[in-house]
């Protein structure tokens, strides 16, 4: 028996305490709470982190410098062009990026069989970039991710490289992608009870 199987119940207890703390502080995306509760109700699984998918605008000092980047705007819902334009006006230096990231969930599984079962279910629900993120003596983690993603440079050092009509088009595409990811989350929530308890 692997250590992660022996320590699973203790790890789950700690993870659920952390989740409850995050819920009380309003740090969990509201549209994913129901799915998290369903996963955590399963005997052989628990969630360790999650994001329900987002549209964001980031200011980055240098290309690839995410460590020192600043979120100018972040939404876990569809956005209006006016919100994006207002947020872009906050840009005062470095590179300006418009991004869409798909939902991501990290789920600990009790056994490798449980992990594979969850991975197959997630992929069948459209989360094609899902994988077994970590297999070690201490933990076994499935990462549930989809393919939807946009990373678009908009400008640099206060200069905008694109016009408003282009922004209208990318906001429309971003909202469509986010809508698709939310549909996948709902499908996963509907299907998750197929996993053994």
Curated annotation (Swiss-Prot):
Keyword DNA repair: no
TM region positions: none
InterPro entries, sorted: Taw3, tRNA_yW-synthesising, tRNA_yW-synthesising-like_sf
Keywords for the protein's UniProt record, in alphabetical order: Methyltransferase, S-adenosyl-L-methionine, Transferase, tRNA processing
Enzyme Commission numbers on file: 2.1.1.282
Pfam families: TYW3
Single GO BP term: wybutosine biosynthetic process
UniProt family annotation: Belongs to the TYW3 family.
Function, in words: S-adenosyl-L-methionine-dependent methyltransferase that acts as a component of the wyosine derivatives biosynthesis pathway.
Protein name as annotated: tRNA(Phe) 7-((3-amino-3-carboxypropyl)-4-demethylwyosine(37)-N(4))-methyltransferase
Source species taxonomy: Archaea, Methanobacteriati, Methanobacteriota, Thermococci, Thermococcales
Designated gene of the protein: taw3
């Amino acid at each position: 028996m692997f250590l992660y199987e022996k320590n699973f119940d203790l790890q789950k207890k700690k993870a659920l305490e952390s989740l409850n703390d995050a819920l009380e502080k309003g740090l969990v995306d509201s549209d994913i709470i129901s799915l998290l509760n369903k996963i955590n109700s399963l005997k052989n699984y628990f969630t360790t982190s999650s994001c329900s998918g987002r549209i964001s605008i980031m200011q980055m000092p240098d290309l690839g410098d995410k460590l020192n980047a600043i979120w100018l705007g972040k939404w876990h819902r569809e956005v209006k062009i006016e919100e994006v334009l207002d947020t872009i006006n906050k840009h005062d230096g470095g590179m300006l990026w418009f991004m869409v990231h798909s939902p991501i969930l990290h789920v600990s599984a009790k056994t490798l069989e449980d992990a594979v079962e969850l991975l197959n279910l997630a992929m069948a629900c459209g989360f094609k970039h899902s994988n077994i993120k970590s297999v070690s003596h201490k933990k076994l983690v499935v990462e549930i991710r989809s393919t939807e993603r946009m990373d678009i440079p908009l400008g640099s050092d206060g200069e905008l490289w694109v016009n408003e009509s282009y922004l209208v088009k990318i906001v429309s595409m971003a909202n469509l992608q986010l809508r698709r990811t939310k549909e996948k989350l709902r499908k996963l929530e509907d299907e998750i009870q197929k996993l053994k308890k």
